[in-house]
Amino acid sequence: MTPPHNYLAVIKVVGIGGGGVNAVNRMIEVGLKGVEFIAINTDAQALLMSDADVKLDVGRELTRGLGAGANPDVGKNAAEDHRDEIEEVLKGADMVFVTCGEGGGTGTGGAPVVANIARKLGALTIGVVTRPFSFEGKRRQVQAEAGIDELRNQCDTLIVIPNDRLLALGDRNISMMDAFRTADQVLLSGVQGITDLITTPGLINLDFADVKSVMSGAGSALMGIGSARGENRAVEAAEAAISSPLLEQSMDGARGVLLSIAGGSDLGLFEINDAAQLVTDAAHPDANIIFGAVIDDALGDEVRVTVIAAGFDGGTPAYKAAEPARKTNQNQPTQSSTPVVPSPATPAAPQSPRRVLFDDVDVPDFLKNGS
Protein backbone atom coordinates (compact mmCIF):
# COMPACT_ATOMS: atom_id res chain seq x y z
CA MET A 1 0.00 0.00 0.00
CA THR A 2 1.37 3.40 -0.96
CA PRO A 3 1.95 5.62 2.10
CA PRO A 4 -0.11 8.84 2.17
CA HIS A 5 1.58 11.95 0.83
CA ASN A 6 1.70 15.28 2.63
CA TYR A 7 0.25 17.73 0.14
CA LEU A 8 0.52 20.72 2.48
CA ALA A 9 3.31 23.20 1.77
CA VAL A 10 5.99 23.18 4.47
CA ILE A 11 6.60 26.78 5.56
CA LYS A 12 9.43 27.80 7.90
CA VAL A 13 9.96 31.25 9.40
CA VAL A 14 13.53 32.06 10.43
CA GLY A 15 14.23 34.98 12.73
CA ILE A 16 17.92 35.81 12.90
CA GLY A 17 19.53 38.30 15.26
CA GLY A 18 17.81 40.26 18.01
CA GLY A 19 15.17 41.89 15.82
CA GLY A 20 14.40 38.71 13.92
CA VAL A 21 14.04 36.59 17.05
CA ASN A 22 11.78 39.25 18.59
CA ALA A 23 9.61 39.11 15.47
CA VAL A 24 9.32 35.33 15.67
CA ASN A 25 8.36 35.59 19.34
CA ARG A 26 5.56 37.99 18.40
CA MET A 27 4.24 35.61 15.73
CA ILE A 28 4.22 32.76 18.24
CA GLU A 29 2.49 34.95 20.81
CA VAL A 30 -0.47 35.71 18.55
CA GLY A 31 -0.76 32.12 17.37
CA LEU A 32 0.34 32.21 13.73
CA LYS A 33 -0.56 28.74 12.43
CA GLY A 34 0.72 26.42 9.76
CA VAL A 35 4.42 27.33 10.00
CA GLU A 36 7.53 26.15 11.84
CA PHE A 37 9.52 28.79 13.71
CA ILE A 38 13.31 28.86 13.84
CA ALA A 39 15.30 31.33 15.98
CA ILE A 40 18.98 31.91 15.23
CA ASN A 41 21.24 34.19 17.27
CA THR A 42 24.78 34.72 18.48
CA ASP A 43 23.38 35.98 21.79
CA ALA A 44 22.75 32.80 23.77
CA GLN A 45 20.96 34.58 26.62
CA ALA A 46 18.43 36.22 24.29
CA LEU A 47 17.91 32.92 22.46
CA LEU A 48 16.90 31.20 25.70
CA MET A 49 13.89 33.55 25.94
CA SER A 50 12.46 32.44 22.59
CA ASP A 51 9.57 29.98 22.27
CA ALA A 52 10.56 28.98 18.73
CA ASP A 53 10.27 25.34 17.67
CA VAL A 54 13.98 25.31 16.86
CA LYS A 55 16.64 27.46 18.53
CA LEU A 56 20.13 27.58 17.06
CA ASP A 57 22.99 29.44 18.71
CA VAL A 58 25.58 30.19 16.05
CA GLY A 59 29.13 31.42 16.48
CA ARG A 60 29.64 29.60 19.75
CA GLU A 61 33.40 29.52 19.30
CA LEU A 62 33.57 32.92 17.60
CA THR A 63 31.45 34.98 20.00
CA ARG A 64 31.19 32.66 23.03
CA GLY A 65 27.45 33.31 23.02
CA LEU A 66 27.83 37.01 23.72
CA GLY A 67 26.52 38.47 20.46
CA ALA A 68 28.07 39.93 17.31
CA GLY A 69 28.77 43.42 18.67
CA ALA A 70 26.84 45.08 15.80
CA ASN A 71 29.49 43.78 13.37
CA PRO A 72 27.95 42.17 10.24
CA ASP A 73 31.21 40.36 9.45
CA VAL A 74 30.97 38.55 12.78
CA GLY A 75 27.34 37.68 12.05
CA LYS A 76 28.22 36.34 8.62
CA ASN A 77 31.13 34.25 9.88
CA ALA A 78 29.02 32.89 12.73
CA ALA A 79 26.36 31.70 10.30
CA GLU A 80 28.93 30.27 7.90
CA ASP A 81 30.58 28.33 10.75
CA HIS A 82 27.24 26.61 11.41
CA ARG A 83 26.16 26.23 7.81
CA ASP A 84 25.56 22.48 8.12
CA GLU A 85 23.32 22.94 11.18
CA ILE A 86 21.30 25.66 9.44
CA GLU A 87 20.90 23.46 6.38
CA GLU A 88 19.65 20.61 8.55
CA VAL A 89 16.86 22.67 10.16
CA LEU A 90 15.78 24.09 6.78
CA LYS A 91 15.55 20.77 4.95
CA GLY A 92 12.13 19.85 3.66
CA ALA A 93 10.80 23.42 3.46
CA ASP A 94 8.83 24.54 0.42
CA MET A 95 8.91 28.17 1.56
CA VAL A 96 11.31 29.94 3.92
CA PHE A 97 10.84 33.41 5.36
CA VAL A 98 14.01 35.13 6.60
CA THR A 99 13.35 38.07 8.90
CA CYS A 100 15.70 40.42 10.72
CA GLY A 101 16.30 44.01 11.69
CA GLU A 102 18.93 45.34 9.29
CA GLY A 103 21.83 47.41 10.58
CA GLY A 104 23.11 45.25 13.43
CA GLY A 105 25.51 42.33 13.40
CA THR A 106 23.93 38.89 13.48
CA GLY A 107 20.88 39.62 11.33
CA THR A 108 22.61 41.85 8.80
CA GLY A 109 25.52 39.48 8.26
CA GLY A 110 23.77 36.17 8.83
CA ALA A 111 20.49 36.60 6.96
CA PRO A 112 22.07 36.35 3.48
CA VAL A 113 23.77 33.10 4.54
CA VAL A 114 20.47 31.62 5.71
CA ALA A 115 18.72 32.74 2.52
CA ASN A 116 21.48 31.27 0.37
CA ILE A 117 21.14 27.91 2.10
CA ALA A 118 17.34 27.91 1.81
CA ARG A 119 17.41 28.72 -1.87
CA LYS A 120 20.02 26.06 -2.61
CA LEU A 121 17.71 23.56 -0.93
CA GLY A 122 15.03 24.55 -3.45
CA ALA A 123 12.76 26.53 -1.13
CA LEU A 124 10.94 29.68 -2.23
CA THR A 125 12.88 32.20 -0.14
CA ILE A 126 11.32 35.47 1.00
CA GLY A 127 13.11 38.12 3.04
CA VAL A 128 11.09 40.45 5.27
CA VAL A 129 13.34 42.99 6.97
CA THR A 130 13.40 46.49 8.38
CA ARG A 131 15.55 49.49 7.67
CA PRO A 132 16.58 51.19 10.97
CA PHE A 133 15.31 54.50 12.31
CA SER A 134 17.41 57.51 11.32
CA PHE A 135 18.11 58.26 14.97
CA GLU A 136 20.02 54.99 15.23
CA GLY A 137 22.94 56.62 13.47
CA LYS A 138 24.78 56.76 10.16
CA ARG A 139 26.87 53.65 10.72
CA ARG A 140 23.81 51.49 11.30
CA GLN A 141 22.14 52.98 8.20
CA VAL A 142 25.17 52.20 6.03
CA GLN A 143 25.42 48.66 7.37
CA ALA A 144 21.70 48.17 6.77
CA GLU A 145 21.89 49.22 3.11
CA ALA A 146 24.82 46.89 2.49
CA GLY A 147 22.95 44.06 4.20
CA ILE A 148 19.78 44.71 2.22
CA ASP A 149 21.70 44.65 -1.06
CA GLU A 150 23.37 41.36 -0.14
CA LEU A 151 20.13 39.76 1.03
CA ARG A 152 18.32 40.82 -2.15
CA ASN A 153 20.88 38.82 -4.13
CA GLN A 154 20.11 35.68 -2.13
CA CYS A 155 16.28 35.81 -1.92
CA ASP A 156 13.56 35.16 -4.46
CA THR A 157 11.70 38.16 -3.08
CA LEU A 158 12.73 40.81 -0.56
CA ILE A 159 10.32 43.11 1.27
CA VAL A 160 11.93 46.03 3.13
CA ILE A 161 10.04 48.11 5.69
CA PRO A 162 11.56 51.48 6.64
CA ASN A 163 11.08 52.09 10.36
CA ASP A 164 11.08 55.85 9.76
CA ARG A 165 7.69 55.41 8.08
CA LEU A 166 6.24 54.61 11.48
CA LEU A 167 6.69 58.32 12.21
CA ALA A 168 4.23 59.10 9.39
CA LEU A 169 1.38 57.14 10.93
CA GLY A 170 -0.13 60.28 12.42
CA ASP A 171 -0.11 60.46 16.21
CA ARG A 172 2.82 62.46 17.58
CA ASN A 173 1.88 61.36 21.09
CA ILE A 174 2.40 57.66 20.42
CA SER A 175 4.73 56.08 22.97
CA MET A 176 7.99 54.44 21.96
CA MET A 177 6.71 51.03 23.04
CA ASP A 178 3.45 51.40 21.11
CA ALA A 179 5.42 52.38 18.00
CA PHE A 180 7.54 49.25 18.26
CA ARG A 181 4.43 47.18 18.97
CA THR A 182 2.84 48.58 15.82
CA ALA A 183 5.95 47.65 13.85
CA ASP A 184 5.83 44.11 15.24
CA GLN A 185 2.19 43.86 14.18
CA VAL A 186 3.00 45.04 10.66
CA LEU A 187 5.75 42.43 10.33
CA LEU A 188 3.39 39.78 11.64
CA SER A 189 0.82 40.87 9.07
CA GLY A 190 3.39 40.64 6.29
CA VAL A 191 4.31 37.04 6.93
CA GLN A 192 0.78 35.96 7.81
CA GLY A 193 -0.63 37.73 4.77
CA ILE A 194 1.40 35.39 2.60
CA THR A 195 1.07 32.20 4.64
CA ASP A 196 -2.71 32.58 4.98
CA LEU A 197 -3.02 32.64 1.20
CA ILE A 198 -1.69 29.07 1.28
CA THR A 199 -2.81 27.61 4.60
CA THR A 200 -6.32 29.07 5.05
CA PRO A 201 -9.17 27.67 2.93
CA GLY A 202 -10.83 30.45 0.96
CA LEU A 203 -13.89 31.24 -1.12
CA ILE A 204 -11.45 31.66 -4.00
CA ASN A 205 -8.47 29.49 -3.07
CA LEU A 206 -4.80 30.11 -3.69
CA ASP A 207 -2.14 27.47 -3.28
CA PHE A 208 1.63 27.35 -3.00
CA ALA A 209 2.06 27.17 -6.78
CA ASP A 210 0.06 30.41 -7.17
CA VAL A 211 2.24 32.23 -4.66
CA LYS A 212 5.41 30.83 -6.19
CA SER A 213 4.39 31.99 -9.67
CA VAL A 214 4.47 35.60 -8.45
CA MET A 215 7.33 35.54 -5.94
CA SER A 216 9.91 33.20 -7.47
CA GLY A 217 12.87 35.30 -8.62
CA ALA A 218 10.83 38.49 -8.30
CA GLY A 219 13.46 40.66 -6.59
CA SER A 220 12.15 43.60 -4.58
CA ALA A 221 8.50 43.53 -3.55
CA LEU A 222 5.99 45.78 -1.84
CA MET A 223 3.26 44.83 0.57
CA GLY A 224 0.22 46.87 1.52
CA ILE A 225 -2.50 46.17 4.07
CA GLY A 226 -5.86 47.92 4.33
CA SER A 227 -9.14 47.50 6.16
CA ALA A 228 -12.43 49.39 6.11
CA ARG A 229 -16.09 49.29 7.10
CA GLY A 230 -19.11 50.99 5.62
CA GLU A 231 -20.73 51.40 2.24
CA ASN A 232 -17.55 51.45 0.12
CA ARG A 233 -15.52 49.23 2.44
CA ALA A 234 -13.88 46.98 -0.15
CA VAL A 235 -12.68 49.82 -2.37
CA GLU A 236 -11.54 51.87 0.64
CA ALA A 237 -9.63 48.88 2.02
CA ALA A 238 -7.95 48.36 -1.36
CA GLU A 239 -7.07 52.06 -1.58
CA ALA A 240 -5.55 51.90 1.89
CA ALA A 241 -3.53 48.82 0.95
CA ILE A 242 -1.97 50.35 -2.16
CA SER A 243 -1.27 53.73 -0.52
CA SER A 244 -0.06 52.67 2.93
CA PRO A 245 2.33 55.21 4.51
CA LEU A 246 4.62 52.29 5.33
CA LEU A 247 5.33 51.84 1.60
CA GLU A 248 8.15 54.09 0.48
CA GLN A 249 7.76 53.06 -3.15
CA SER A 250 4.92 52.93 -5.66
CA MET A 251 3.46 49.66 -6.93
CA ASP A 252 3.05 51.16 -10.39
CA GLY A 253 4.53 48.80 -12.95
CA ALA A 254 4.38 45.61 -10.87
CA ARG A 255 4.24 42.57 -13.16
CA GLY A 256 3.26 40.14 -10.41
CA VAL A 257 0.54 40.81 -7.83
CA LEU A 258 -0.90 38.68 -5.04
CA LEU A 259 -4.28 39.99 -3.90
CA SER A 260 -6.22 38.68 -0.92
CA ILE A 261 -9.66 40.00 0.09
CA ALA A 262 -11.28 38.86 3.33
CA GLY A 263 -14.71 39.64 4.73
CA GLY A 264 -17.80 38.24 6.40
CA SER A 265 -20.46 36.12 4.76
CA ASP A 266 -22.09 39.27 3.37
CA LEU A 267 -19.05 40.06 1.21
CA GLY A 268 -20.50 40.83 -2.20
CA LEU A 269 -19.32 39.85 -5.67
CA PHE A 270 -19.43 43.43 -6.93
CA GLU A 271 -17.45 44.59 -3.88
CA ILE A 272 -14.75 42.07 -4.69
CA ASN A 273 -14.77 43.09 -8.34
CA ASP A 274 -14.41 46.81 -7.57
CA ALA A 275 -11.54 46.25 -5.13
CA ALA A 276 -9.74 43.91 -7.50
CA GLN A 277 -10.15 46.35 -10.39
CA LEU A 278 -8.60 49.14 -8.34
CA VAL A 279 -5.53 47.04 -7.64
CA THR A 280 -5.36 45.83 -11.24
CA ASP A 281 -5.35 49.40 -12.53
CA ALA A 282 -2.38 50.24 -10.30
CA ALA A 283 -0.25 47.38 -11.63
CA HIS A 284 1.46 46.82 -14.98
CA PRO A 285 -1.02 46.23 -17.86
CA ASP A 286 0.46 42.76 -18.43
CA ALA A 287 0.73 41.85 -14.74
CA ASN A 288 0.17 38.29 -13.55
CA ILE A 289 -2.49 38.89 -10.88
CA ILE A 290 -3.23 36.03 -8.51
CA PHE A 291 -6.40 36.61 -6.54
CA GLY A 292 -7.85 34.95 -3.44
CA ALA A 293 -10.92 35.63 -1.31
CA VAL A 294 -11.89 34.20 2.06
CA ILE A 295 -15.04 34.35 4.14
CA ASP A 296 -14.37 34.90 7.84
CA ASP A 297 -17.44 35.78 9.89
CA ALA A 298 -15.20 36.92 12.76
CA LEU A 299 -14.50 40.06 10.70
CA GLY A 300 -18.13 41.17 10.96
CA ASP A 301 -18.72 44.05 8.55
CA GLU A 302 -14.98 44.68 8.07
CA VAL A 303 -13.19 43.99 4.79
CA ARG A 304 -9.44 43.45 4.74
CA VAL A 305 -7.21 43.61 1.69
CA THR A 306 -3.61 42.43 1.36
CA VAL A 307 -1.60 43.29 -1.74
CA ILE A 308 1.88 42.00 -2.56
CA ALA A 309 3.42 43.57 -5.66
CA ALA A 310 6.60 42.23 -7.24
CA GLY A 311 8.34 41.74 -10.58
CA PHE A 312 9.19 45.34 -11.37
CA ASP A 313 11.08 46.45 -14.48
CA GLY A 314 14.70 46.87 -13.45
CA GLY A 315 14.12 44.75 -10.35
CA THR A 316 13.04 47.54 -8.00
CA PRO A 317 9.88 49.63 -7.62
CA ALA A 318 9.82 53.31 -8.46
CA TYR A 319 10.56 55.58 -5.52
CA LYS A 320 7.58 57.27 -3.90
CA ALA A 321 8.28 60.46 -1.97
CA ALA A 322 7.34 60.42 1.71
CA GLU A 323 4.21 62.32 2.68
CA PRO A 324 3.93 64.24 5.95
CA ALA A 325 1.71 62.80 8.65
CA ARG A 326 -1.93 63.68 8.10
CA LYS A 327 -4.56 64.35 10.71
CA THR A 328 -7.19 61.66 11.02
CA ASN A 329 -10.43 62.53 9.24
CA GLN A 330 -13.01 62.09 11.97
CA ASN A 331 -15.77 61.80 9.39
CA GLN A 332 -14.15 58.65 7.99
CA PRO A 333 -13.07 56.60 11.00
CA THR A 334 -13.46 53.22 9.33
CA GLN A 335 -10.46 53.10 7.00
CA SER A 336 -7.07 51.90 8.15
CA SER A 337 -3.85 51.00 6.38
CA THR A 338 -2.08 49.63 9.45
CA PRO A 339 -2.99 47.05 12.06
CA VAL A 340 -4.57 48.41 15.24
CA VAL A 341 -2.67 47.89 18.47
CA PRO A 342 -5.06 47.07 21.35
CA SER A 343 -4.97 49.51 24.25
CA PRO A 344 -3.79 48.14 27.62
CA ALA A 345 -7.35 48.36 28.96
CA THR A 346 -8.80 46.28 26.14
CA PRO A 347 -7.85 42.61 25.74
CA ALA A 348 -6.67 41.74 22.24
CA ALA A 349 -9.29 40.00 20.15
CA PRO A 350 -8.53 36.45 18.99
CA GLN A 351 -6.53 36.41 15.78
CA SER A 352 -8.77 35.76 12.78
CA PRO A 353 -7.70 33.28 10.09
CA ARG A 354 -7.15 36.06 7.54
CA ARG A 355 -5.39 38.81 9.43
CA VAL A 356 -2.48 40.24 7.51
CA LEU A 357 0.79 41.77 8.57
CA PHE A 358 4.34 42.95 7.80
CA ASP A 359 7.42 44.39 9.66
CA ASP A 360 10.38 43.59 11.82
CA VAL A 361 11.61 46.33 14.07
CA ASP A 362 15.23 47.01 14.87
CA VAL A 363 15.14 47.84 18.59
CA PRO A 364 17.88 50.25 19.70
CA ASP A 365 20.35 48.83 22.22
CA PHE A 366 19.10 51.10 25.01
CA LEU A 367 15.61 49.55 24.76
CA LYS A 368 16.73 45.94 24.91
CA ASN A 369 17.11 45.89 28.72
CA GLY A 370 20.26 43.87 28.41
CA SER A 371 18.71 41.09 26.34
Language-model features, listed with the residues they occupy:
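Tubulin/FtsZ superfamily GTPase core signature
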Residues: M1-S371
